[in-house]
From Swiss-Prot:
Gene3D superfamilies the UniProt entry points to: FAD/NAD(P)-binding domain
Keywords, comma-separated and alphabetical: FAD, Flavoprotein, Monooxygenase, Oxidoreductase
Swiss-Prot/TrEMBL cofactor(s): FAD
Protein name per UniProt: FAD-dependent monooxygenase SAT1
GO MF annotation: an example: FAD binding
Domain of life assignment: Eukaryota
Binding sites annotated in the UniProt record for FAD: D108
Species of provenance: Stachybotrys chartarum (strain CBS 109288 / IBT 7711) (Toxic black mold)
Miscellaneous section: Trichothecenes are sesquiterpenoid toxins that act by inhibiting protein biosynthesis.
Protein purpose: FAD-dependent monooxygenase; part of the satratoxin SC1 cluster involved in the biosynthesis of satratoxins, trichothecene mycotoxins that are associated with human food poisonings. Satratoxins are suggested to be made by products of multiple gene clusters (SC1, SC2 and SC3) that encode 21 proteins in all, including polyketide synthases, acetyltransferases, and other enzymes expected to modify the trichothecene skeleton. SC1 encodes 10 proteins, SAT1 to SAT10.
Entry EC no(s): 1.-.-.-
Gene that encodes it: SAT1
């Protein structure tokens, strides 16, 4: 179960709190003005059934944690707001197929992590970056033609192989974090109570997480910042040619922008000169230079 509420004055902003017990735990996150709380309980057995929770389920589950302390003398019943709460079963697992034809999956659609370690969101972002970089590469290599399904399938296979190792590792870390916070067995209890602080301080934060952040993927493309570029790009894709417009050219004024969009624009590719030419245009001539070539 999750819920949001105004941050209590007794809890400083930016602090994170955990309340742990056998098979149950609470995680508290605090922002500047609001706080978020997550209540976890271990199911008697793993389940593949879809569960739809109603408002009465949320209230009943929250009431079972009502006297739990979430921060010093602050208890759950003092802060929880049922009107902003929701509830569902946590799902975890990795699908076998990440793509089919021209369709590719990212984030929770292909790998679900428990939320305790916050690794699901971060892996989803890395999936998108890896996918965008892979698609950009195959589109660039295709020249002025659209990549066919066979080329996309090879690209998505590369994307899968690139991401398989990182999210397999994070899946294990996320799984362990959930079970440690709920004391799933004696080993998890001992490790969480007596060893985890040393482990998290000296190994997890200083080495594992730092290395992962430093080796994270970044986009290899330029993002168009001009409204003109975005509109022209969509116009040209539906017309004569399809290409990635990487030169963000900002129009001088709205009048010029309207003239360009109203004009009958036809773009011809001069392959021999590797430049763009705009013809049949009633608007003023627009010269576009390739930033990568200066």
């Amino acid at each position: 179960m999750w819920a949001s509420f105004p941050r209590p004055e007794a809890i400083p902003p930016g602090y994170v709190g955990e309340t742990q017990h056998q098979h149950r735990s609470i995680m508290l996150l605090n922002g500047k003005s609001r706080s978020w709380i997550f209540l976890y309980e271990r199911l008697p057995a793993p389940s593949h059934d879809r569960v739809k929770c109603i408002a009465e389920d949320v209230i009943e589950f929250a009431d079972s944690f009502a006297d739990w302390s979430i921060w010093n003398n602050t208890k759950l019943e003092d802060v929880v707001d049922h009107s902003t709460a929701g509830m569902s079963n946590l799902e975890e697992g990795i699908v076998k197929n990440f793509s089919h034809g021209r369709i590719v999956l990212v984030g929770d659609a292909c790998h679900k992590f428990t939320s305790n370690a916050g690794l699901g969101l971060n892996n989803g972002i890395q999936d998108i970056v890896a996918g965008c970089n892979s698609i950009r590469k195959v589109v660039t290599e295709s020249g002025f033609d659209l990549p066919d399904v066979k080329a996309l399938e090879a690209t998505f296979k590369t994307y899968y192989e690139m991401r398989l190792g990182p999210f397999n590792d994070d899946f294990i870390h996320s799984k362990m974090m959930t079970r440690m916070q709920a004391w799933a067995n004696t080993w998890y209890f001992l490790f969480t109570r007596y060893l985890f602080f040393i482990f998290s301080e000296w190994i997890l934060f200083r080495f594992t997480m730092l290395r992962r952040v430093c080796t994270g993927l970044v986009l290899t493309m330029h993002l168009a910042k001009s409204r003109l570029v975005a509109l022209l790009n969509g116009f040209i894709r539906s017309g004569y040619h399809s290409f990635i417009w990487i030169s963000a050219i900002r129009p001088c004024n709205d009048q010029l922008l309207n003239q360009l969009l109203a004009g009958a624009i036809q773009i011809e590719i001069l392959c021999s000169l590797n430049t763009w030419r705009i013809s049949s245009c009633r608007a003023p001539l627009l010269l576009v230079f390739d930033q990568a070539r200066g």
